[in-house]
């Protein structure tokens, strides 16, 4: 017997069938795609950073544990802060 899947458009959120409404299932699909995507480790640059729990990410190669966002290793706010810190460090190195 062949299993039939109703997940062509909605992806993994198809497991909920017609429950909860389309918008919520689409949002869930987008979050799950981000969450399961392969990310690079900031320590060793190996592309196998995996989510262990909420905001906890572990590299398969070097074993580095990183605290990040709930669904992605680096949040939008974290990127902004990192850029600001880099600018400050660069401006101080230019002064010297």
Curated annotation (Swiss-Prot):
**Which GO molecular-function terms appear in the entry?**
large ribosomal subunit rRNA binding; structural constituent of ribosome; zinc ion binding
InterPro entries found in the cross-reference section: Ribosomal_eL37/eL43 (IPR011331), Ribosomal_eL43 (IPR002674), Ribosomal_protein_eL43 (IPR050522), Ribosomal_zn-bd (IPR011332)
Q: Which Pfam families has this protein been placed in? A: Ribosomal_L37ae
Keyword Ribonucleoprotein in annotation: yes
Q: State the needed cofactors, names only.
A: Zn(2+)
One GO BP annotation here? translation
* C4-type zinc finger locations on the chain: 41-62
Q: Which UniProt keywords apply?
A: Metal-binding, Ribonucleoprotein, Ribosomal protein, RNA-binding, Zinc, Zinc-finger
Q: Give the record's GO CC terms.
A: ribonucleoprotein complex; ribosome
Hydrolase found in the keyword field: no
Q: Which residues form a coiled coil?
A: none
Q: How is the cofactor bound?
A: Binds 1 zinc ion per subunit.
Top-level lineage group:
Archaea
Q: Which NCBIfam families match?
A: eL43_euk_arch, PRK03976.1
Q: What family is this protein classified in?
A: Belongs to the eukaryotic ribosomal protein eL43 family.
Report what the protein is called.
Answer: Large ribosomal subunit protein eL43
Q: Which lineage ranks, top first, belong to the organism behind this chain?
A: Archaea, Methanobacteriati, Methanobacteriota, Methanomada group, Methanococci
**Which gene name belongs to this protein?**
rpl37ae
């Amino acid at each position: 017997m062949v299993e039939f899947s109703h997940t062509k458009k909605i992806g993994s959120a198809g497991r909920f069938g017609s429950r909860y409404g389309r918008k919520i299932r689409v949002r869930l699909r987008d979050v799950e795609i981000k969450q399961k995507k392969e990310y690079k480790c900031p320590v060793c640059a190996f592309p196998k950073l995996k989510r262990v729990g909420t905001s906890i990410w572990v590299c398969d190669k070097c074993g580095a544990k990183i605290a990040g966002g709930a669904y992605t290793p680096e949040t939008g706010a974290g990127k902004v802060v990192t850029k600001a810190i880099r600018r400050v460090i660069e401006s101080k190195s230019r002064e010297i």
